Amino acid sequence: MQLLAQTCEAIAATSKKTEKIAIVATYLQSRTVPEAALSTLFLSGRTFAAHEERTLQVGGSILWRVVGELSGASEAKMTAAYKRHGDLGDATLGVLRGVAPEESTLTLKEVDYMFQQIAAVSGPAAKSRLIVTLLARATAPEAKYLVKFITGELRIGLKESQVEEAIAKAYGRELAEVRRANMLVGDIGETLVLAAHDKLATARMRLFHPMGFMLATPAESANEAFAEFEHAIVEDKYDGIRAQAHISRDKVRIFSRTLDDITDSFPELIPALKAIEHEVILDGEILAWRCGQALAFSELQKRLGRKNVSAAMQREVPVSYVTFDLLYAKGQLVIDRPLQERAAMLDGIFSEGAPRLVNVDPHGQASLMFAEVTPEQRVLRAPQARADSPEELDRLFAAAQERGNEGLMIKDIHSAYAVGRRGKSWLKLKRELAMLDVVVTAVELGHGKRAGILSDYTFAVRGGEELLNIGKAYSGLTDKEIAEMDEWFRAHTLVDHGFVREVEPKIVIEVAFNAVMKSDRHASGFALRFPRILRIRDDKGGEEIDTLERAEEIYRSQFHQRTRRIHRGDTKAQSS
């Protein structure tokens, strides 16, 4: 464990990607294969393989108490350490220095065993006892990184893609082979073992091991979107939960964008998905659905996180699964095939009698109108259209919004499915009102009827490895949501300043705003004008929030639009 902590320090000390990869590769070569496999997990910010359902379920408040107990530090000293470092792992190093053991006796195998024990028990008290046992044996630098591993906030400027590069470098393998194997097995540790034994080619796709989702890049206008592709498929952008459905003859599992198993939250989808009678992996969206129309996302949120969904809840918030892509079929992974071919294969899975959302007019243009759905017909093929001009895209965009959907997805018909990556092969055209996915970093007590309730949220975008505050919002959520969030934030407070609390950066929210402005008030250098919360993004993790670069893009685009309007105005004035 000591050498891994030292390696993490070395990685954090350089900003050069090539140096980070070289440091990791050298470290991996110095370890046994089992040790190296465990290390790749931890270096990727995980305690268990991506495909595993196990999690530690340890909040910052538990770690705060444990570190305080071991160090003997007062609440004031703990708070000062956290304020100074802005990171619980670094604060741990500060308060345990001179208190923790000087000699290292902790092995990676023992760390892995303790993580398994922590995941297996329930309740803060039981988890705290195990964490005390683990950290009590660690040196201060080791404790720093153990805390970071537990929180999943490593923050050393290392991505899993760079760990893949290090594996390729350490064992002399082709990077493309390493990446493909990791995508297939869903376990960076197992990928290392295959690379070490020159068996990457034996990696096989396994059902019920979720893959990363292909993500879209925002487009600012129909003109921009249309200019990207000569030939594209156009679909509605749904306001639901992105979900990957794995189906065999006797089993169905549904995974969220964060690769969590959410099958139990949607039991009525299981028989409908089983009826497909093919071994497949589908990509799609779960929608709250009634009377042939998608309901607001706030309705769908009522279903999230429930292990036992009552019949009454199923009636109140009925759901359907709208599928728009095929990743695996007939024992083969099809992600490398062009979208047009995958779409044709997906069409073939849906027999003539199966429910469909596409009504084709005499000109062969999909109308994008929704069909009525019976309770037994909960799996639907997403409608697709083609657009021959930006004006046609605008028409389809307006029609999608009339149906209560967010906007449009525009997809290159020749594109492969880029697992876990965002690119310009898929574009998303959303509402004209600008939006960002941000993470809550601090909360404040409200006023008036919300006095005493943590209802004002400060939020951040990601700038490299840092979270940079960019705004504050207090409107948009229901009273019920605010009450639930108040409870969560109190349980996950890192630093309590009285009126304001710094909280674990875990809650992702989608905020809308009118403009991005330059500002010295926030660390990002920007502020959002008239921000309001659209929804809580339970389906997204903190690593998926928007970046500072994205905020800068919106700012520049506003500037260019203003410049064009001014130019048009000047031209009109001169002509008159």
From Swiss-Prot:
Q: Which parts form a coiled-coil structure per UniProt?
A: none
Protein name according to UniProt = Probable DNA ligase
What is the top-level taxon of the source organism? Bacteria
GO MF annotation terms? ATP binding; DNA binding; DNA ligase (ATP) activity; metal ion binding
Its Enzyme Commission number(s) read 6.5.1.1
Print the keywords alphabetically: ATP-binding, Cell cycle, Cell division, DNA damage, DNA recombination, DNA repair, DNA replication, Ligase, Magnesium, Metal-binding, Nucleotide-binding
Q: Name one GO biological process term.
A: DNA biosynthetic process
Q: Which InterPro entries match?
A: ATP-dep_DNA_ligase, DNA_ligae_ATP-dep_bac/arc, DNA_ligase_ATP-dep, DNA_ligase_ATP-dep_C, DNA_ligase_ATP-dep_cent, DNA_ligase_ATP-dep_CS, DNA_ligase_ATP-dep_N, DNA_ligase_N_sf
The top of its lineage is: Bacteria, Pseudomonadati, Acidobacteriota, Terriglobia, Terriglobales
The record's Pfam families line, in alphabetical order, gives: DNA_ligase_A_C (PF04679), DNA_ligase_A_M (PF01068), DNA_ligase_A_N (PF04675)
General function of this protein: DNA ligase that seals nicks in double-stranded DNA during DNA replication, DNA recombination and DNA repair.
What cofactor does its activity depend on?
Mg(2+)
